[in-house]
Design a protein with these regions (language model features):
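N-terminal membrane topogenic signal
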Residues: 1-9
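Non-transmembrane, membrane-proximal soluble domains of secreted or membrane proteins
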Residues: 2, 17-50, 71-287
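Hydrophobic alpha-helical transmembrane signal-anchor segments
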Residues: 9-15
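Alpha-helical transmembrane segments
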Residues: 46-60
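Transmembrane alpha-helical segments in integral membrane proteins
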Residues: 59-76
Length: 287
């Protein structure tokens, strides 16, 4: 009886697991669920994720099927003696070469995605970013995200200018807390820093994740191709308030107008109407 029980157990629960995995996208249980990535690179990461999931699923079904067959066949006759083997050179070669071949295929298949994400330069650094790019500095600190933008209308033509801007605050800079605005359908360049401990910049809908390390400035490239608001969270345990270190990334059509709006609110003194320059005042130069 116990043999039949264990045979059924190792046969039924894999079937249940496969059914649950099959219906999970429709129930919004799956990761990344039924929400498509909002970046082109994120969509390629999803394709890679589902490819690996498919390979693992086929392997799981084959392994559990073989186990169920052996259990069922062995439970028919309790008097039948088992066959003991001290190993098979041919089998060892097969189950070494096949997994190695699968891993090699995955490694080669993902090289292009990994190159775009971590290796390949997005621009010629001697020339600089395109004027349409957004450049912003994001500083993680317990327990919030501090964002600094260059003054509205600022255009960097070389990376030397970007480094000079990052080195210190400048007149006309725009600041925000826990709210990052980015161009829709244009590349965004973020320089990520930490003011205290290790944090992690994580936007699930964009499939973007990067640790923020104290003493380092790490650049992140991504392009948001869907309008909307996306949750920004810290994915590294950073202290007692880690749970509330949340923000938002919003993709907008007219980023310069949004930055101008933020600048007006930032300069508002409670008396002078936003968007006006007080008499005698002049705008200072920006990098």
């Amino acid at each position: 009886m116990s043999r039949i029980f264990w045979c059924l157990f190792f046969t039924v629960w894999p079937i249940i697991a496969i059914v649950v995995c099959a219906i999970s996208p429709a129930m919004d249980w799956a990761f990344p669920g039924n929400r498509e990535a909002a970046t082109p690179l994120g969509q390629r990461i999803d394709d890679l994720f589902f490819l690996i999931t498919g390979i693992v699923t086929v392997t799981f079904i084959g392994t559990m099927g073989a186990l169920s067959y052996v259990l069922w066949k062995g439970s028919k006759n309790e008097d039948e003696k088992g066959w003991y083997s001290h190993g098979s050179h041919n089998l060892e070669v097969i189950w070494t070469i096949v997994p190695a071949g699968v891993l090699l295929f995955i490694a080669l298949y993902q090289l292009d995605v990994w190159a775009i994400y971590r290796v390949r330069d997005h621009e010629n650094r001697d020339v600089g970013p395109r004027p349409s790019h957004l450049v912003a500095e994001v500083t993680a600190r317990q327990f919030e995200w501090r964002i600094r933008y260059p003054a509205p209308g600022t255009k960097f033509t070389t990376y030397k200018q970007i480094k000079a801007w990052l080195a210190k605050p400048h007149a006309g800079d725009v600041y925000a807390v826990n709210k990052l605005f980015v161009h829709l359908n244009r590349e965004t360049l973020i320089y990520l820093k930490s003011a205290d401990v290790q944090h992690a910049f994580f936007v699930p809908d964009l499939r973007v994740k990067q640790d923020a390390m104290p003493g380092q400035s790490i650049d992140i490239w991504f392009t948001v191709n869907k309008s909307g608001k996306f949750n920004l969270t810290c994915a590294e345990l950073c202290g007692w308030g880690h749970y509330k270190m949340r923000g938002e990334v919003e993709a907008v059509e007219d980023l310069q107008a949004k930055l101008k709006e933020l600048k007006d609110l930032q300069d508002y003194d409670g008396v002078t109407p936003p968007g006006t320059v007080p008499a005698g005042a002049s705008e200072e130069a920006t990098p």
